Amino acid sequence: VANQYGGNQNLEAIEFFKHLNSVLTGRKDGCMIIAEESTAWPKVTHRPEEDGLGFTFKWNMGWMHDFLEYMKLDPIYRKFNHNHMTFGLTYSTSENFILVLSHDEVVHLKCSMINKMPGIYEDKFANLKAGYTFMLGHPGKKLLFMGQDFGQFHEWDEKVSLDWYLADEPLHADLQSYVRGLLTLCLLYTSPS
């Protein structure tokens, strides 16, 4: 249904988000409003005064898709697909992005992060370390889902606990230590804003 200007934007919804986000961010209590938005709607994280929607952050769905496609490839074929890893840099400053590897990517037969990686057992861990290192160096805030830090093998299931015993296995413990080190570097060398 066309709006009063002939477009297909829901003008009332736009005004609702602008108002809601202005009120919430105006409280100055540390509230973050994060948009999971996949349509390339412009200015999601810009202030309403700049004709933005006023969200604090936006999931970078394009980066996530490209990252996962690249990381699933056998390393011998990656040299033909580096564009998957570099394209996100062309728009990385257009919004306040969060690089998300969410629950959506480790359910419904999509595999856990470690099982998305190519290669034999040890190679999977090396590939995931390389991927996380790239992620930490890419512009945007970072968000891993539970179990991704130690190499959870099973897909996420809200009815079942994580396989915490894996964190005691050498390669899993090493991955967890590696992620801890990456996050420590991130805290030391990035601004809090």
Set out the residue ranges of the language-model regions.
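Active-site beta-strand/loop architecture of penicillin-binding DD-peptidases
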Residues: 162
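Catalytic cores of secreted or luminal carbohydrate-active enzymes
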Residues: 171-188
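Conserved small/polar residues in nucleotide/adenosyl-binding loops
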Residues: 189-193
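Conserved alpha/beta catalytic core and glycan-binding cleft of carbohydrate-active enzymes
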Residues: 2-158, 166, 174, 187
